[in-house]
């Protein structure tokens, strides 16, 4: 991921909050999609998880605790999750699935094919819960493939395509926060595409 926290610049309290959101997202990915889904955990979706949980704090029940996991088998770690965390868990798996499918189609990468096969059922479940978002992922990747096939050098159009995808994903509920979330997602998506 590209949205990485500056841990040195975070207070101990902020570091703890970030880590609990990261671990909460990992835990929910595992609960919804199993251990294989945990490989889709990313800093980018952790950022979205923190953003959405902060915006909707108090509107949805939050859960927290201390648990051990495969990465931390000895000492338990603090985790925190809420409804937006499940949303981010589904998006994480779906994004990795469609990205792996894209790599298979472009490069015939066997690892990508294997990984996408592992995520087939999980992505189908995520697509049932979030059809608008999963359709946007598919449409964006198809449009990006068209740009690549045409040899497009229009960075604004190409990055704007990925920005539009991120705007759709950031717009969790299509509610009062939609304009701000879409703007953040769009501009962040353009930036991420240009970095990549």
Identify the residue ranges that each predicted region occupies.
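Acidic catalytic motifs of isoprenoid enzymes
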Residues: 1-183, 194
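Membrane-embedded alpha-helical segments that form the functional core of polytopic membrane enzymes
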Residues: 184-188
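Glycine/small-residue-rich hydrophobic helix-like segments
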Residues: 189-195
């Amino acid at each position: 991921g590209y949205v990485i926290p500056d841990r040195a610049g975070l207070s101990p309290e902020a570091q703890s909050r970030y880590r609990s959101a990261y671990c909460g997202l990992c835990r929910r990915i595992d609960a919804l999609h199993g251990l294989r889904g945990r490989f889709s955990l990313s800093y980018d979706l952790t950022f979205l998880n923190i953003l959405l949980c902060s915006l909707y704090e108090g509107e949805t029940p939050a859960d927290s605790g201390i648990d051990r996991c495969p990465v931390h088998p000895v000492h338990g770690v603090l985790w925190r999750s809420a409804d937006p965390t499940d949303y981010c868990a589904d998006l994480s798996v779906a994004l990795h699935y469609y990205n792996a499918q894209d790599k298979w189609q472009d490069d015939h990468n066997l690892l990508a094919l294997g990984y996408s096969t592992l995520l087939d059922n999980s992505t189908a479940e995520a697509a049932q819960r979030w059809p608008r978002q999963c359709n946007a992922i598919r449409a964006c990747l198809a449009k990006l493939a068209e740009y690549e096939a045409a040899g497009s050098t229009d960075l604004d159009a190409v990055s704007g395509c990925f920005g539009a995808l991120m705007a759709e994903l950031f717009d969790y509920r299509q509610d009062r926060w939609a304009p701000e979330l879409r703007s953040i997602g769009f501009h962040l998506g353009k930036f991420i595409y240009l970095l990549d």
